[in-house]
Amino acid sequence: MVYDSEIQFTLDTICPWTYLAKRRLDKALAQIREDSSTPVNFTVKFKPYQLYPGASQEGEDKYAWYRKSRYGDSDEKMAKYMHLMSMYGNKEGIDFKFGGTVANTLPAHRLIQHFQEKGGPEMSNAIVNSLYRQYFEEEKHPSATETLLTAANEAGIDETEAKQFVEDENEGLQDVKMLIREQAGNGIDAVPYIVIEGKRRDITIEGAKEVEEFVKALESIIKESS
């Protein structure tokens, strides 16, 4: 009998470490799924988190914000960060860029959560992949209407339906805010934060671990579910 394991992946669409973690988890899942006899069906469910909840919708310069808020206005430290992230990104097929705008991500989370509930894991996965790529590799605004509609289109969502949802800024907003509060209540104060549901126990992974560590965790869930 196949055991259904939900992987709760808490993220913010402006967090580069969650982008790396998702790529690595995707690779690990692909390895595990190569064995068609695996007695566990893994499904990823995304949960919202905000790195910068006080950000405006208009946003501010991404490079300047990182340099000031994370690296003490040091160009040297910022250069080291960009080199490190570029190196990590290249390994996972991500072409990190550091320009663009950092802004409030509530509209992006609203899109993810609404269509995750309505369209399922494949749809939400496509939305998240698009939002990450647009923000980190194409320097797009993280929650502009154009960005959200592009993500919806790439996920196969009807254009009229997507536009209607995106433009109704209140639909699903309180639900997303409640989910964010729930995550805080669960003690989550950094992302990525990943919980792999198991038959005997859950496995929690914090941070952007390597592919091998994700594989090891998934294999443990499989072993304990057999």
Question: How does the language model describe each region?
Answer:
Residues 4, 67-68, 90, 162, ...:
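Generic signal for short, ordered secondary-structure residues
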Residues 7-10, 14, 22-34, 113-226:
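C-terminal cap of thioredoxin/glutaredoxin-like
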Residues 2, 39, 106, 188-189:
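A generic fold-level signal
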Residues 2-8, 42:
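Extreme N-terminal starter segment of soluble prokaryotic enzymes
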